[in-house]
Amino acid sequence: QPTWMPKVKLYYFGTYGGILKVHTFAENLATDEDRDIASLVKGMEEDPYIGVTEAAIAALKELGLDKSGKVGIDDTRFVAALEGVLSPDRVVDATNFLIEIRMVKTPDEISILREAARKNQNAITSAISTIREGATWDEVHRAYEIQVASEGARVFANFNGAGVKSAGAGRPDRVYPIKKGDQVCFDSMLKWKRYMGDVQRTVVLGEPDKKMLTYWDAFTAGIDTAYEALRPGIETGKLREQTIEAVRLNGLPSFELAFTHGIGLDHIEVPFIAGGTLGDFPVEENMVLNIDLELHEVGWGGMFFEETMLITKNGAERLYDLERELISV
């Protein structure tokens, strides 16, 4: 979608001692898009900037911010490039502030995220359909990638694996022939129009054993608690505590990993605090958030549930309609 920003600075890449120019134009431009591109490029040619630094300096001067005022920047390493134009004492680290702004989505963004969820659901459903005795995780993973491509989207990542190799997202070797009773765990992510789709599910081939059922019953308690509590006003830290407590009280006392994160242009849109720790934040209407519950029991396997929720005035709307239960095939 076109940007809603009132003014945008374009710049060229510098190369070979000059400017790397890309566009030439036909005499007659047939579409509005062509005419918009021509207008932007020709405006840039009147006063060309080489590189983002020149463009940023020009913008600061036009706004009078080289003389006074505070400037928020989402990467304070860029301050060094503005030396002589903007003194460090007038720079504010606006990383979290800009993340927080992005967390409340526009109608266009919500529409794209709905599309991303639908495409991701189609892809994970296709992958689930390939699960059979003797199949490997690589085959299942490949089915996901093929369906993502057929949806016109792009694979971002597809964790986790099957059986004892379904715990631990970073395993270098996930080759494993699936057996009856094994869980197959998905953490499946794609990009659509630069926005993320992200969903997790746990599938079992055949009937789950007693341990898996016990664990999933505990997960269900946590999932239900999260759905019930997710609404404007709740702090994500409180939501996490309630979810973890519900899982622990219902059969999985060692459970640790549940959290909520924003999703959009980035996989995880969450304010950060010192040391790279994920920060808590109050939930607001029109945020798009993922609720995420994961178990990594090395030597046994994993259990996963995650999906995307649009925060409404009084609660939350699911963007996926995949079944919420342990999926048996």
How should these model regions be labeled?
Residues 1-329:
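Active-site neighborhoods and metal-handling regions in enzymes and metal-associated proteins
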